[in-house]
């Protein structure tokens, strides 16, 4: 359960990082 939550968090961070790079 902990690993699944971590993976979901990592995915969210990656999505935010991509959107930030698109803005720049």
Curated annotation (Swiss-Prot):
Coiled coil: none annotated. Transmembrane segments: none annotated. It comes from the Eukaryota. Expressed in testis. GO terms for biological process: negative regulation of execution phase of apoptosis. Keywords: Cytoplasm, Secreted. Induction: Down-regulated 6 hours following staurosporine (STS) treatment and up-regulated 24 hours following STS treatment. Down-regulated 6 hours following beta-carotene treatment, returning to its basal level 24 hours following beta-carotene treatment. Belongs to the humanin family. PANTHER family: HUMANIN-LIKE 4, HUMANIN-LIKE 7. Plays a role as a neuroprotective and antiapoptotic factor. This is Humanin-like 7. It comes from Homo sapiens.
